[in-house]
A protein has these predicted regions:
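Flexible "arm" and connector segments at domain edges
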Residues: 1-61, 67-171
Length: 171
């Protein structure tokens, strides 16, 4: 028997079968809330594999994270909400929008310029104007012991002080 390379569609189909009437009793009864911690656990396991530079384990953990994404999308699809296609459509649109230096007429020659542009576009997208609004965008589920990445702190300060990109780059 020939080994077939599975696709994202195969994973969606597997999750759909597991949640079907003749599927797995455990998978069938799960909700967003009941598997919330599973999503976090898989993300932390992927982060741990990165920290340990264990690429074989990272591959496995990324699969587990992807399975969680598909699982949540399938739950929502069953409830008449968004689909996995909507998730993919949304992230593709976001990546294109936030990379105008690649997909449009924007300009960014350094990683720092990309981050500044990214955060400005995100601010515009989310209609965040004040430091309070920026800080309110920090996820409530973020554990208190986990510091924000340095660029998030810089972002909040830059937006609060309304320093222009030109001023920042000229210093």
């Amino acid at each position: 028997m020939e080994n077939k390379m599975n696709t994202l569609e195969d994973l969606v189909r597997i999750i759909r079968i597991l949640r079907s009437e003749n599927g797995c009793p455990w998978d069938r009864v799960q909700t967003h809330a009941s598997i919330r911690m599973d999503m976090l656990e898989e993300a932390y396991e992927a982060a741990d594999a990165i920290d340990k530079k264990d690429m074989k384990n990272l591959c496995e953990e990324l699969g587990d994270v992807l399975m969680q994404v598909v699982f949540h999308a399938e739950i929502e699809t069953e409830q008449g909400g968004f689909t996995m296609g909507d998730v993919i459509q949304g992230i593709c649109e976001k990546m294109i929008y936030r990379h105008p230096h690649v997909f449009g007429s924007g300009k960014a020659d350094t990683a720092e310029e990309v981050l500044i542009n990214w955060e400005e576009l995100k601010k515009k997208e989310k209609r965040q104007e004040t430091q309070t609004e920026v800080m309110q965008s920090v996820p409530e589920a973020l554990p208190a012991g986990i510091p924000l990445p340095p660029w998030k702190t810089v972002k909040a300060k830059l937006m609060f002080l309304k320093i222009s990109v030109a001023t920042l780059l000229s210093s």
